[in-house]
Amino acid sequence: GIPCGESCVWIPCLTSAVGCSCKSKVCYRN
């Protein structure tokens, strides 16, 4: 539920390496 400061409209979340995932075109962590 914490925004990772990255969008995932065009590309996947690069922050997925630190546990972030794409939700509603924005990368979130928990």
From Swiss-Prot:
PTM characteristics: This is a cyclic peptide.
GO terms, biological process: defense response
Claim: Disulfide bond is one of the keywords in the record: yes
Cross-link (Cyclopeptide (Gly-Asn)): 1-30
Domain of life assignment: Eukaryota
Keyword tags: Disulfide bond, Knottin, Plant defense
Keyword Disulfide bond in annotation: yes
S-S bonds: 4-20, 8-22, 13-27
Coiled coil (UniProt feature): none
Name of one Pfam family that matches: Cyclotide
Domain notes: The presence of a 'disulfide through disulfide knot' structurally defines this protein as a knottin.
Recorded family membership: Belongs to the cyclotide family. Bracelet subfamily.
Function: Probably participates in a plant defense mechanism.
Protein name as annotated: Cycloviolacin-O9
Lineage of the organism: Eukaryota, Viridiplantae, Streptophyta, Embryophyta, Tracheophyta
